[in-house]
Amino acid sequence: MTVLIHVLGSDIPHHNRTVLRFFNDALAATSEHAREFMVVGKDDGLSDSCPALSVQFFPGKKSLAEAVIAKAKANRQQRFFFHGQFNPTLWLALLSGGIKPSQFFWHIWGADLYELSSGLRYKLFYPLRRLAQKRVGCVFATRGDLSFFAKTHPKVRGELLYFPTRMDPSLNTMANDRQREGKMTILVGNSGDRSNDHIAALRAVHQQFGDTVKVVVPMGYPPNNEAYIEEVRQAGLELFSEENLQILSEKLEFDAYLALLRQCDLGYFIFARQQGIGTLCLLIQAGIPCVLNRENPFWQDMTEQHLPVLFTTDDLNEDIVREAQRQLASVDKNTIAFFSPNYLQGWQRALAIAAGEVA
């Protein structure tokens, strides 16, 4: 049987590193279909830190796409697992027959599914991408994204799968000893990416709570984002006093980020699509409820796991937030499907499906 090849077709260092390390640590030892990777980006020590994997690096999307297409044409039994599919050339290859549906398995990351960019180039490309998506052999995604995808592509097979968020399961039962009274601290957004719509989110928080809460905005990723960070800072200072606005412009190490999240009382995410599962998982693990946009279908996954969900359209106050905290504290976090290690079973099944080992 031909070994499955995994494709990380865009240079997204943070997510690519997470996927590679997860496969190296959790999957490669037990499955030959979890070892072969083609990745856009620099090695930057990844080969050394992932010795169980065979990783081929490419300088850009186009060179990787050309190599994938060549392999697909040379052997029609060769199957590919695309982790987040932001590479236009690969979509066009699927549409034109360069890659066959039986070769194309896609794990939806969120941004690769929704059509939210307003640029002309994107507007022209979206219809072609939609046509190509009808030809995918199988999609893997969150419950909410599967539901969203099925509305336009009901005939494409869909399977539940969660991004392998880096988590320490031993923290599931750790009581959050933060004092749950007094001034609340609200986390706004999951990164410095513009998709978080930080300024609108800050205005929404201010409309709900005024200048009575402390707002923390993590913006250390992506790099070279100083102009936008300053734009958000100035908008924030028009709404909140300096002592109530904390904008983090430096990238935090994982443990420091975890400590930051545990100082919060609420997460506030205004984006109208599924994103930031990693941050949501870490907040939920710490007993911190989240406010989501109703257009973000991840609320379906949360309610399926009996987790409280607040919405940006709700009338929020401290009593409602404290009640959500109490509800979250009563949930057995060891049973949550999108937590580590529970998502591992979904990955083992996904590998078997993509490799053709199970129907």
UniProtKB/Swiss-Prot annotation:
MF annotations from Gene Ontology: 4-acetamido-4,6-dideoxy-D-galactose transferase activity; fucosyltransferase activity
Pfam families referenced in this protein's UniProt entry, alphabetically: Glyco_transf_56 (PF07429)
UniProt catalytic activity: beta-D-ManNAcA-(1->4)-alpha-D-GlcNAc-di-trans,octa-cis-undecaprenyl diphosphate + dTDP-4-acetamido-4,6-dideoxy-alpha-D-galactose = alpha-D-FucNAc4-(1->4)-beta-D-ManNAcA-(1->4)-D-GlcNAc-undecaprenyl diphosphate + dTDP + H(+)
Keywords per UniProt: Cell inner membrane, Cell membrane, Glycosyltransferase, Membrane, Transferase
Keyword check for Transport: no
Pathway connected to this protein: Bacterial outer membrane biogenesis; enterobacterial common antigen biosynthesis
Membrane topology type: Peripheral membrane protein
E.C. code: 2.4.1.325
Keyword Membrane among UniProt keywords: yes
Location(s) in or outside the cell: Cell inner membrane
Gene Ontology cellular component terms for the protein in this record: plasma membrane
InterPro entries (alphabetical): WecF
Any one biological process term the GO annotation gives: fucosylation
Function: Catalyzes the synthesis of Und-PP-GlcNAc-ManNAcA-Fuc4NAc (Lipid III), the third lipid-linked intermediate involved in ECA synthesis.
UniProt similarity note: Belongs to the glycosyltransferase 56 family.
Protein name: TDP-N-acetylfucosamine:lipid II N-acetylfucosaminyltransferase
Organism whose genome encodes this protein: Shigella boydii serotype 18 (strain CDC 3083-94 / BS512)
